[in-house]
């Protein structure tokens, strides 16, 4: 009986992991420029392309992103799984998207398991801009990117943000892979942090561990003072290719 139940749950988890949902949220930012009101962004994270997630997977994902017709696309790391793969081929589908304000990417922890040059070259070659301790200004909004390994220690993360030069009088969006040290993000004037990494725990009992580590920032939209944080489940899986109690997702964000 137990074995049959385990097999059924596993089968459900594998099927559920391939069904990518679209999560829709609205974020209100203080002093948002008029040009940004009503604009949308698609947030993608934790695709984990490699042996399990292949070219067919990324083509389906990119097609779903394209259907949303958002103004800008954010990819917050772990696009690749740090395994041997055709990096250029797996990045190529992104080049088929028409995104008015562009696509932006920050490195996650899995891309740091080996030389990240291959990933960065592939992503850049597909027309995606890599943000690494960098800031881009788009119609009065500051878009900031900090890679995972620059955000794991609070004081180093703080120094990185301070060096970027954030204008506290204008809204800012931080792309960084994990919802670590969100108090630092808030203290340095970030308006909205977008992250992934947690997978929502992916399945029991890891969901409990993730909630214990990250608390309210483990998944969804949360607030810490003036800082808002959205942590996504991500679009892929790590380890067993299954999800039970969580959904694979991409996020359509509307700004107001």
Predicted regions and their residues:
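Internal/C-terminal transmembrane anchor helices
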Residues: 1-16
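Soluble catalytic domains of enzymes that build or remodel membrane lipids, polysaccharides, and related
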Residues: 28-256
């Amino acid at each position: 009986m137990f074995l049959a139940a385990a097999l059924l749950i596993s089968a459900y988890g594998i099927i559920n992991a391939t069904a990518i949902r679209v999560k829709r949220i609205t974020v209100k930012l203080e002093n948002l420029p008029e040009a940004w009101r009503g604009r949308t962004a698609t947030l993608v994270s934790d695709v984990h392309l490699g042996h399990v997630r292949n070219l067919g997977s990324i083509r389906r994902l990119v097609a779903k992103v394209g259907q949303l017709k958002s103004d800008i696309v954010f990819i917050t790391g772990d696009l690749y799984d740090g395994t041997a793969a055709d990096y250029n081929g797996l990045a190529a589908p992104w080049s088929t998207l028409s995104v008015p304000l562009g696509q932006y990417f920050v490195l996650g922890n899995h891309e740091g398991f080996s030389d990240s040059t291959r990933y960065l070259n592939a992503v850049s070659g597909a027309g995606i801009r890599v943000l690494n301790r960098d800031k881009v200004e788009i119609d009065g909004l500051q878009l900031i990117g900090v890679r995972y390994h620059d955000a794991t220690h609070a004081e180093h993360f703080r120094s990185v943000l301070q060096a970027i030069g954030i204008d506290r009088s204008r809204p800012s969006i931080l792309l960084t892979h994990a919802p670590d040290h969100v108090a630092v993000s808030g203290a340095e004037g970030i308006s909205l942090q977008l992250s992934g990494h947690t997978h929502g725990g992916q399945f029991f009992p890891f969901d409990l561990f993730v909630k214990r580590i990250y608390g309210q920032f483990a998944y969804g939209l949360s607030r810490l003072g003036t800082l808002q944080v959205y942590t996504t489940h991500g679009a892929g899986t790590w380890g067993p290719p299954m999800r039970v109690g969580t959904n694979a997702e991409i996020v359509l964000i509307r700004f107001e």
